[in-house]
Amino acid sequence: MERWRDRLALVTGASGGIGAAVARALVQQGLKVVGCARTVGNIEELAAECKSAGYPGTLIPYRCDLSNEEDILSMFSAVRSQHSGVDICINNAGLARPDTLLSGSTSGWKEMFNVNVLALSICTREACQSMRERKVDDGHIININSMCGHRVPPPAETHFYSATKYAVTALTEGLRQELREARSHIRATCISPGVVETQFAFKLHDKDPEKAAATYEHMKCLKPEDVAEAVIYVLSTPPHVQIGDIQMRPTEQVT
């Protein structure tokens, strides 16, 4: 990880869960990290914790609504003017709404698509442009995907979400192919976790907290830090090593 020291990583959805764990891990490794979310109170608290802990890196909170392209473009412009540009882009932000295919709301589908697919694609495009215009040829795009991007689980309320995650799988491989055709050594990786104990289920089942809690009670789930360790592993591999996808799940998870 020494080659990444003092370089800049962007982490979307950094206000909690996997995003916060990834941001902390990168700061521990000596990186400058721009952590973005719609609200930055939690990121500001995490930045203060990292500073008081004496970690060698820095966490920079940035308020950004990823469903708004202008917000995303403004963020990349600010990063360019204040920090030169992005060397690592970790597309972590994602959401699920309980909108089924037979009776779901169009607004719920759009909300998932806008964040899980479009925002990820816009951030990827802007990050790659930032790298290439500065002749950064060892940058890395890491998409925090899901096991739902590789198989469709039975619960109907996860089916549209799964479709957005299948899109992430395709987008990551498509990006790898385009970068190779452009003779770039920027790398593209998916990390696809199974059940991770976060607030994800509580947001999906916000009207049924007992159902949400049950998601995490029947087995020992992954922790956000487990996914953060996978991110560090991917970044620590030599530049000639291309890791396309890491699928990880709790040992007790059925599918």
Curated annotation (Swiss-Prot):
Give yes or no: UniProt keyword Signal. yes
What protein am I looking at? Dehydrogenase/reductase SDR family member 11
Species name: Bos taurus (Bovine)
Name any Gene Ontology BP term.
estrogen biosynthetic process
Which of UniProt's keywords are assigned here?
Answer: Lipid metabolism, NADP, Nucleotide-binding, Oxidoreductase, Secreted, Signal, Steroid metabolism
Gene Ontology cellular component list: extracellular region
On whether Signal is a keyword of this UniProt record, the answer is yes
Q: Which residues form the signal peptide?
A: 1-25
One Pfam match, given by its short name, reads: adh_short
